[in-house]
Design a protein with these regions (language model features):
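Aromatic-rich, lipid-facing transmembrane alpha helices and their immediate juxtamembrane interface loops
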Residues: 1-144
Length: 144
């Protein structure tokens, strides 16, 4: 876990930044069933699901480029399929024009950036800087 600590922090920071910037104008949100709260589900997601994803995704990342593309594609499909199930069960909600297609594209970037951060963290942070501004502009997110 120590090897991927910085990448886990990068991921958590990006997710928390989304929740902060889009607090009153969320593009997607979780609507858990009682007795679970949104905060509890978010914490479980942050510290168990997302951290576990990074450990599995990067920990078993194949050295071969052909297999690495397939590995990344598998994770994009897993995350998108999971989101589709959550969407169909009403646990996940889209707002303000966000769709499953947007999530699919977002997942592609997310997994590419996770791998890139593992290899070149400074470059990844520089490349990540415009993403919130692009999303703010595309989806008319009011700045807090």
């Amino acid at each position: 876990m120590k090897k991927y600590y910085a990448t886990i922090l990068y991921f958590l920071f990006c997710d928390v930044l989304y929740y902060y910037l889009a607090y009153n104008h969320r593009l997607w949100s979780i609507t858990p069933t009682p007795p679970l709260t949104s905060e509890f589900v978010a914490l479980i997601g942050e510290f168990i699901v997302f951290a576990g994803t990074i450990l599995l995704f990067l920990g078993r990342y194949p050295p071969n480029q052909f297999f690495s593309i397939r590995w990344t594609g598998l994770w994009v499909i897993l995350y998108t399929a999971n989101e589709w199930v959550l969407l169909k069960t009403g646990t996940f909600v889209y707002e303000h024009g966000w769709t499953l297609v947007h999530s699919f594209i977002f997942n592609i970037f997310m997994f590419i950036f996770l791998r890139l951060h593992d290899q070149r963290p400074i470059l990844t942070m520089i490349l990540s800087l415009p993403i919130p501004f692009i999303l703010i502009k595309l989806f008319s997110i009011p700045i807090r």
